[in-house]
Amino acid sequence: MAVLYGAAAANAFNVSPPVKSSPGEHGGNIRSLTDTVTYATQTTSDTIVIGGGLLPVGARVLEVIMTTSVTTGSATLALGITGTVAKYKAAGAVTTANVPQVFGLAAALNVPLTAPEQLFLTIAGASLPASGTLVVTVLYVVD
């Protein structure tokens, strides 16, 4: 039976000399950017800026967690930045109420940011519900 390694494990255990893991791979302090959105029939093509600050240079996003109090129905949400509106979450409905759902596009995860990022949600498909809340949490490391 073969012994296989993920990229970080290969660097740490299967090369000589070992390569130091990044904070996103081992030992990093996880930080969060969290915001709450109150639904009020926000319409398609609207954007909702989230977070009390920017993701800093060097941050490595690990995952995005969304929890909604009501289903978004036909409304879809994407999470991204200017120029890449679906960088962290492709447009999709959040259809299970009160159950945290984890998102993250693999190409954008554990990649150090070269510039600060302001995150926003983009609405498509239909308007958001008339009432309820959405909590968005972005977990990242920067050390």
Residue ranges of each PLM-predicted region?
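Surface-exposed, low-hydrophobicity beta-strand/loop segments enriched in small/polar/acidic residues
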Residues: 2-143
